[in-house]
């Protein structure tokens, strides 16, 4: 046991950054409501950082903060702020001004090429080949998510497509986050805290005992969550 009451450690977290391109709070509120409706499992009540670097017109920060908070999103900081007056307003509300890492200079656009004939469509996939630790949230928008390592309890995987976990799955897995009921979850070792497909979910104690800790495949059948062995 440590002899000191606190201990400071470096850590990293996965957060969504909302880039504001409009200074009118009502417009931002409606745009966020629409975005949350598309992927409620990922965005509802999510912690976010607001990036204000693209704002050119003056903004009523108090009204903007209320508009964002009214959607259920939790503003934990602001980035991209260069205006001294806006900085003062933000800090007065108790929100930290966050400094982002330096961005790489954009590469010049490649010269246009003639379209290739008979091109085979490619399905996008997000691949994670490192362990997903407690507190991490990984989202794969409009694609499948593949994790080739273990997922700790307290971690969260979210994908608009399918989820594949080739390791011990102890966290939460939410496939079909944007409502696709044809998506599936594949695990080589199912010990999840929660599994969900298009909003239909099981908590850990609802997973049939014969599949717990086993290789399993989950999908919706007649709008009900089902599980079967993964062969």
Curated annotation (Swiss-Prot):
Segment forming the signal sequence: none
GO process annotations (BP): cell morphogenesis; division septum assembly; regulation of cell division; regulation of cell septum assembly
Superkingdom assignment: Bacteria
Residue span of region Disordered: 102-125
Compositional bias per record (Low complexity), positions renumbered to this chain: 114-123
Xref: Gene3D superfamilies: 2.160.20.70, 3.30.70.260
Quaternary structure note: Interacts with MinD and FtsZ.
Family recorded in the similarity comment: Belongs to the MinC family.
Name listed for the protein in its UniProt record: Probable septum site-determining protein MinC
Lineage: Bacteria, Pseudomonadati, Pseudomonadota, Gammaproteobacteria, Enterobacterales
Gene: minC
């Amino acid at each position: 046991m440590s002899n000191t009451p606190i201990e400071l450690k470096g850590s990293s977290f996965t957060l969504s950054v909302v880039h504001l391109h409009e200074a009118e709070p009502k417009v931002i509120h409606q745009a966020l409501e629409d975005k949350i409706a598309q992927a409620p499992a990922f965005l509802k009540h999510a912690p976010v950082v607001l990036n204000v670097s693209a704002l050119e017109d003056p903004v009523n920060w108090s009204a903007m903060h209320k508009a964002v908070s009214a959607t259920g999103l939790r503003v934990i900081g602001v980035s991209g702020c260069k205006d001294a007056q806006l900085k003062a307003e933000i800090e007065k509300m108790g929100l930290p001004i966050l400094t982002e890492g330096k961005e790489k200079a954009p590469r010049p656009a490649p010269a246009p090429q003639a379209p290739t004939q008979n091109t085979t469509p490619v399905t996008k996939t997000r691949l994670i080949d490192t362990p997903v630790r407690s507190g991490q949230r990984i989202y794969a928008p409009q694609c499948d998510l593949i994790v080739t390592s273990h997922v700790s309890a307290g971690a969260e995987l979210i994908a608009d497509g399918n989820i594949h976990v080739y390791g011990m799955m102890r966290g939460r897995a939410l496939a079909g986050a944007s409502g696709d009921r044809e998506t599936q979850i594949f695990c080589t070792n199912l010990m999840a805290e929660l599994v969900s497909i298009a909003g239909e979910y099981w908590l850990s104690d609802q997973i049939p005992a014969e599949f717990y800790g086993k290789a399993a495949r989950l999908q919706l059948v007649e709008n009900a969550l089902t599980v079967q062995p993964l062969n």
